[in-house]
């Protein structure tokens, strides 16, 4: 069967035809590491990890680029508020994001470029836009001229988001000398105390949108297959990426995919609303593989409404799969069902794919009860193939029953130690607090103190 994906740009299901036969090129807008990652952040990573795994399963060679926005207004503000160097702040939370992705079984990207490492490419991109008449310099800043681009032949500005140009305002704070309210910064002139890099237009730092256009085309070429990201990036970020790229003469992304939000009580999960659930906090409730199962269980274009009940139900669903594979014993990866393939080829319809997995588990348990071991092994092999595509094959995760019990026991023991440490810190008994931390470190357990609380991970 042929994979069809929902292309946000055309608002239609389109057959995926790679630019280069046998290869797929994918760019995912990654982290802006300003704070601890929450499950809204990592849902995007899990959703498009499933896309990547399915492309690989269909025999394609996949170049997967996931960037890090390591210079940004919010990063500078957060670092300044806490009296920390911006680069230290970024490095701290970049490690947190990497840990979260790895813990949830997200495959590492082919390359993970940082914005600050690609200023040369950004300068070249800006020069092309200026030469083409779609960017201008004012007092050391460089802006994209939206009015000029909209008037140009072939312009499609606003088509991705559906916004009307006359209703758009970019919200740039440093807008002195801008020709129009819709114009956005490609390069921001240096301010005292802020990091900056030299350019032909003076010292400064990159604008958010320019970073991704420059990095995507540098690694994947002027035209590539799929650009992914969260729905909240559709405007202004992705709309402006397209404008820059097309104005520079690049074909850019041929398909656009956006995952929906994680919500709580109907509200989008965000730091500003104070309704975030950090990954470490979630891992106090369920195992990493169960959290991955939960985050990937809804269709990527659907809202995932968080509740304790839904999380518990998802964890129980995974354990049913795990228990069946454990009962069968050692089994090789088999072949997925036709229904599973049809579901995945229809815009990654994971809920339907999960139904196929659970049907196989039910049939397999019935086969075991009837003593039909050959049939049970065949079904377990199919389950391994299907769960492998979704990134939670129980055998690959090593989460058989004994390991689960050991993990739960470890959780209890570490939690007790952390409570003892918290009590000591509250009483300013630093010697005891340090003793607990050092004892855990000697056992290979790293204690992580963050603004959202304390968490732990195996070193």
Curated annotation (Swiss-Prot):
In Pfam terms, one family for this protein is CysS_C
Single GO molecular-function term? ATP binding
EC number(s) reported in the record: 6.1.1.16
**What does the record give as the reaction this protein catalyses?**
tRNA(Cys) + L-cysteine + ATP = L-cysteinyl-tRNA(Cys) + AMP + diphosphate
Keyword entries, A-Z: Aminoacyl-tRNA synthetase, ATP-binding, Cytoplasm, Ligase, Metal-binding, Nucleotide-binding, Protein biosynthesis, Zinc
Residue positions binding ATP = 271
Task: Name the InterPro entries on file.
Answer: Cys-tRNA-ligase, Cys-tRNA-synt_Ia_DALR, Cys-tRNA/MSH_ligase, CysS_C, Rossmann-like_a/b/a_fold, tRNA-synt_1_cat_dom, tRNAsynth_Ia_anticodon-bd
For this protein, the record's SMART domains field holds: DALR_2
Disulfide bond found in the keyword field: no
SUPFAM superfamilies in the record: Anticodon-binding domain of a subclass of class I aminoacyl-tRNA synthetases, Nucleotidylyl transferase
* Motif 'HIGH' region: chain residues: 31-41
Quaternary structure and partners? Monomer.
What name has this protein been given in UniProt? Answer: Cysteine--tRNA ligase
**What are the leading ranks of the lineage?**
Bacteria, Bacillati, Actinomycetota, Actinomycetes, Mycobacteriales
């Amino acid at each position: 069967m042929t994979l069809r994906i929902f292309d946000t740009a055309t608002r239609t299901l389109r057959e995926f035809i790679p630019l280069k036969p046998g290869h797929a090129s994918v760019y995912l807008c990654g982290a802006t590491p300003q704070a601890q990652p929450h499950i809204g952040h990592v849902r995007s990573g899990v959703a498009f990890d499933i896309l990547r795994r399915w492309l690989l399963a269909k025999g394609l060679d996949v170049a997967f680029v996931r960037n890090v926005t390591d210079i940004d207004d919010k990063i500078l503000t957060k670092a300044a508020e806490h009296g920390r160097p911006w680069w230290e702040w970024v490095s701290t939370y970049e490690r947190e994001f990497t840990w979260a992705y790895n813990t949830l079984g997200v495959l590492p990207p082919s390359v993970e470029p940082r914005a600050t490492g690609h200023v040369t490419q950004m300068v070249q991109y800006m020069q092309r836009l200026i030469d083409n008449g779609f960017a201008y310099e004012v007092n050391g800043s460089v802006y994209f001229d939206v009015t000029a681009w909209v008037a140009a032949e072939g312009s499609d500005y606003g088509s991705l988001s559906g916004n009307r140009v006359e209703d758009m305002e970019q919200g740039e704070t440093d807008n002195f000398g801008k020709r129009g309210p819709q114009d956005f910064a490609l390069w921001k002139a240096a301010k005292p105390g802020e990091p900056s890099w030299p350019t032909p237009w003076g010292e400064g730092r990159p604008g958010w949108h320019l970073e991704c256009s420059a990095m995507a085309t540098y690694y994947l070429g002027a035209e590539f297959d799929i650009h992914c990201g969260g729905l909240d990036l559709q405007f202004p970020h992705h709309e402006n990426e397209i404008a820059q790229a097309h104005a520079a003469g690049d074909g850019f992304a041929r398909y656009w995919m956006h995952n929906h939000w994680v919500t709580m009580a109907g509200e989008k999960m965000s730091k500003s609303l104070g309704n975030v659930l950090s990954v470490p906090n979630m891992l106090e409730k369920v195992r990493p593989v169960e959290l991955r199962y939960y985050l990937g269980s809804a269709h990527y274009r659907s809202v995932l409404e968080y509740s304790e009940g839904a999380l518990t139900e998802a964890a129980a669903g995974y354990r049913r799969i795990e228990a069946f594979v454990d009962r069968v014993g050692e089994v090789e990866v088999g072949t997925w069902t036709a229904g599973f393939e049809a579901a995945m080829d229809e815009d990654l319809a994971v809920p339907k794919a999960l139904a196929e997995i659970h049907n196989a588990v039910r049939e397999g348990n019935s086969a075991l009860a009837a003593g039909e071991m050959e049939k049970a092994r065949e079904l377990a092999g199919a389950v391994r193939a299907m769960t492998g595509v979704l990134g939670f094959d129980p055998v690959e995760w090593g989460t058989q029953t004994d390991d689960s019990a050991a993990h739960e026991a470890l959780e209890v023991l570490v939690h007790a130690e952390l409570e003892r440490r918290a009590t000591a810190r509250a009483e300013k008994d630093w010697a005891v607090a340090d003793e607990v931390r050092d004892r855990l470190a000697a056992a290979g357990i790293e204690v992580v103190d963050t603004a959202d609380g304390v968490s732990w991970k195996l070193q």
